[in-house]
Each structure stands twice: as C-alpha cells, then as structure tokens.
Regions:
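Divalent metal-dependent catalytic cores for phosphoryl transfer on phosphate-bearing substrates
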Residues: 92-199
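Buried hydrophobic packing segments
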Residues: 62, 66-69, 73, 127, ...
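Divalent metal-dependent phosphate-bond-processing catalytic cores, especially two-metal-ion Mg2+/Mn2+ enzymes
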Residues: 1-30, 55-56, 70-90, 159-257
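Alpha-helix N-cap/helix-initiation motif
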Residues: 54, 116-120, 227
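Active-site flanking loop/helix segments enriched in acidic
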Residues: 44-66, 106-113
Length: 257
C-alpha cells in the first residue's frame, strides 16, 4: 500500500464538489497495513488522555475513526489539485490522529470533565476546549497551525455546509465519525462505500468492536441537548431526533458478509 506524498490541505465544503475532486476507488487495505503507519511521539499522550476522559465505547469509536480515516486517505482522497495548498502525508496523519482520538472528549462522564467550565456547551465545543488545553502542552510540540486545525476540526466535526472551505483534517473526522455512527448510508447510497472497502471495515470493527456505541451515543447526545438545547448537532436535517433515529447498533459490515 502506497499513500500519496501530499494531499490537498483544504477542500470545498460542498460535498458534491469534494467528491468531484476525489478519485475514490475502494481498494482493500489490511488493518495490519494501517497499523504500520508511523505516529508522532505525542500520540501516546493523546491516547491516554482520551482513554481517561472519553466513555469506553466512545473511545473505541474514536480509535475506529482514525483507521477509517487512513483507509479513506489511501483510496483516492483529493491530492495534487492545481492551485490548492498541499499538506504532507506525515503531517496530515499527525493532525488526523489527534483529532480522531480526542474528538468525543465532550461525551465525558468523569468528574474532571463535568466540572470543566465548558461542560454546558455543545459537546463538540466542550471537547474541543479540553483538547486544546491538553494539546498546548509544550512537550507535545504542536505549533499554532497544527493546534488550530486539530481543535477546530473537533469543534466542527458534526457541522456541514454548502459553501466555503474546510481542512482535510476536518473532512476526514466528519467522514469517519458519521461512517461509524450512522453506517455506509450516512452521506447517501453508495457514497461512503466508494471510499473504503467492506473487508477493511470488517477488520477494524473486529479488532475494535463497537459494543453498545449506539446506546451510549444516543444517551450522550440527548443528555447534551437537555443541557444545551442550542447544541450543534441539533442543526442536523430533521434535528437531533432525526439523527438519533438513524444511529446504528449493529456492525457496519456484518462478520459473515
């Protein structure tokens, strides 16, 4: 498996325009190959922090999101588009790892998380602020551009627009998180299926089982909506109620498929 050396750093927010730039072909990539992608030294600190703060099923969901993101990157994610700034594979992976592993800190039920002054905000903002406070530690060696992209992507990962520009980091966390929570139909029939091979999904789900993610996601989102009726995910078409109804309980790809 060979990844492109660079990718488009920014993408159209409009989903159809994004798809037009991509060259997706869902080739099978083994989880073993994805595990072999090098990570920056700071990833361990984010892994341990997310494991401590995020509820277990949400944490395992975050791990799956990272590997889904890598598979999508390998299968035709926009790269080398004329006039678009490029980001190296190594740099993008660094940002995507921290974003994915930390993106649901706002689901926390820990005393530390619930005592945080941001706990009454929409969970994406609450989690983004906690991620910022964690990532700005000097020993993690993230500059302002890296930190800004990671935190902004966490804060906006449930938001979609038809105009403007998003970073590739934000696009990947949105794609992978909605794939894991809603399944292959999240962006319409055949869309996510064009980006990632079902066997790759199956291997990731087998290694990192979804457990009761569906129930935990519903509980986290409904609890957040009671505390913050203006929560960001409430802007999903049809509102929070419509989103909650389509959350998956079953594996995305059944083990026998």
């Amino acid at each position: 498996m060979a990844f492109p050396q660079t990718f488009d750093a920014y993408l159209p927010s409009n989903f159809q325009e994004f798809l037009a730039l991509a060259k997706f072909k869902p080739e099978y990539i083994s989880l073993e190959a994805l595990h072999a992608v090098p990570l920056d030294p700071a990833h361990t600190a984010s892994f341990e922090y997310a494991k401590k703060i995020t509820p277990h099923e949400g944490f395992i969901h975050s791990v799956r999101c990272y590997y889904f993101s890598l598979a999508i990157l390998a299968n035709g994610f926009p790269s080398g588009t004329a006039g678009v700034p490029q980001i190296t594979f190594t740099e993008l992976v660094r940002r995507v790892y921290h974003t994915c592993i930390l993106h649901d800190l706002g689901w926390t039920t820990t005393a530390e998380g619930r005592a945080h002054p941001a706990h009454t905000m929409s969970f994406e903002l609450h989690g983004g602020i906690m991620a910022y406070e964690h990532l700005k530690a000097p020993e993690l060696e993230l500059d302002a551009h890296q930190l800004g992209d990671i935190v902004q992507s966490i804060m906006l990962h449930t938001s979609q627009w038809n105009e403007g520009t998003v970073s590739s980091t934000k696009q990947l966390i949105s794609l992978s998180a909605l794939l894991d929570v809603l399944g292959l139909q999240a962006f319409g029939p055949g869309v996510l299926g064009s980006m990632i091979h079902p066997k790759t999904i199956r291997e990731i789900e087998k290694e990192y089982p979804r457990g009761k993610l569906g129930a935990d996601a519903r509980q986290a989102l409904e609890s957040n909506a009671k505390e913050a009726p203006d929560c960001l995910i409430g802007h999903f078409p049809g509102g929070l109620e419509a989103f909650v109804k389509v959350i998956r309980d079953e594996p995305i790809v059944p083990a026998d498929e």
